[in-house]
Amino acid sequence: MEHYSLAQLSKALHNREFSSVELTQHCINKIQSNKDLNAFISLDEDQALKEAQSADLVLKNGEGKPLTGIPMALKDLFCTKRLNTTCASKMLANFQAPYDATIVTKFKQNGAIIIGKTNMDEFAMGSSNENSYFGSVKNPWDRERVPGGSSGGSAAAVAGNLVPFAIGSDTGGSIRQPAAFCGISGIKPTYGLVSRYGMVAFASSLDQAGPFAKSAEDLAMILHCIAGFDSKDSTSVDRVIPDYSAEIKKPVDKIRIGLPSCFFQPQVEKGIQDAIHDAVKLFENLGAEIIEIDLKLQPLWVPCYYVIACAEASSNLSRYDGIRFGHRSKSASTLIELITNSRSEGFGNEVKRRILTGTHVLSTGFFNAYYLHAQKVRRLIRDELITTLNSVDVIIGPTTPTTAFKLGEKINDPIQNYLADVFTVAANLAGLPAISIPTGFENKLPIGLQLMGKHFSESRLLAIAHHYQQHTNWHLANPNKQG
């Protein structure tokens, strides 16, 4: 079952080759036998099996939808009525939301079975999934290495064949970077395409939900399910959603690919540079036009991103004061002590670091110098990317400058962790869609290829990624069968 695509799983379930109960139990067994990955924070086994039984009845009557009866995992920052929503933080370790996030409701309406919620960096702040109150997640390809972050649990669950697909969030690369490190496919949609209602906020102008799966074809199937306008999300865009699964099957011709020289810097591992150049050659052999482009503002991407992201995090996380919800300190005799102690005890070191940074850049005397300046630079970055994408279909490059690094290797060096996002943050700053797909290995560790496109060009982006995967087998590699 674990080698089936989503379309194949759906067809097999509809043809009654095996039942949803059998598939769901298979996933539960895989999760239980791979607990050392630490990919999940919570499981809902009994409810998942009940929903699988219901799905089998629907399928028996020939009334199922494409995702009916297929188990999935959800990053633990999407609100769910049944399961706690912890954000991998002591602050919310026992928090149970009174409602379901829109994305959860959509999956339920489409018959998917939420089997559990995955581990992550605390409040989605991190690039290694080592900043979790519930412990680090391990990479299925090498259990001594990180899976990437912040959606590391979701990526590890898919790469380890624990579930067919999973949902994550991407604020500066938190879907694409783990997808690259774990050798799977992941897409960050255009800002506003997928509802953020019920997704706990890190940086509201940057956050976007998106799927992990083995292939671009699978991503198209999931994205069609979750995309669309939501009146509960003021940033949601009201536009017609195409059938992405149908769109990617159309002929892909006259592809214009932008290749930035600034993506091939000395700090990018040579094996990664070679893999990207090989991918570019393959596209060229398939008839694509390769156009060298110059992104002059690329050196400003990371500093601009971290000023804005930390500022928004500081504002968003001010709601956790130990009074209305979240961890409440037991060692406080005054209101100020209650708030101070609750936040000191409830937040981890990386979250505290970003709150302090954000508060600093928003403070009197520094607002104009840092935050306002970063917002101006953000507009320039956005304009440069949009102008560039008027002459090419996609911008190609590595998803990350390195392959997955060892657990603990960079935990005490936040700057090195932040630089893991050097190629991914721009898509968030500009609100553009971007996808990471597997494109080779270096020392038996996966390499990710990133494609970034115009606003709402998901159909084209997925089609190009699918075109690449039709001519390569990298996305079929399995960590359980390596060397």
Curated annotation (Swiss-Prot):
Gene Ontology molecular-function annotations: ATP binding; glutaminyl-tRNA synthase (glutamine-hydrolyzing) activity
GO cellular component terms attached to this protein's record: glutamyl-tRNA(Gln) amidotransferase complex
UniProt keyword list: ATP-binding, Ligase, Nucleotide-binding, Protein biosynthesis
Gene3D superfamilies with a match to the protein in the record: Amidase signature (AS) domain (3.90.1300.10)
SUPFAM superfamilies: Amidase signature (AS) enzymes (SSF75304)
PROSITE patterns given in the database record: AMIDASES
Name of a matching Pfam family: Amidase
Keyword Nucleus among record annotations: no
UniProt keyword Nucleus present: no
Active site: K75 (charge relay system), S150 (charge relay system), S174 (acyl-ester intermediate)
Catalytic activity entry: L-glutamyl-tRNA(Gln) + L-glutamine + ATP + H2O = L-glutaminyl-tRNA(Gln) + L-glutamate + ADP + phosphate + H(+)
Task performed by this protein: Allows the formation of correctly charged Gln-tRNA(Gln) through the transamidation of misacylated Glu-tRNA(Gln) in organisms which lack glutaminyl-tRNA synthetase. The reaction takes place in the presence of glutamine and ATP through an activated gamma-phospho-Glu-tRNA(Gln).
Subunit and partners: Heterotrimer of A, B and C subunits.
Listed NCBIfam families: gatA (TIGR00132)
Family affiliation: Belongs to the amidase family. GatA subfamily.
Name of the protein: Glutamyl-tRNA(Gln) amidotransferase subunit A
Protein encoded by which gene: gatA
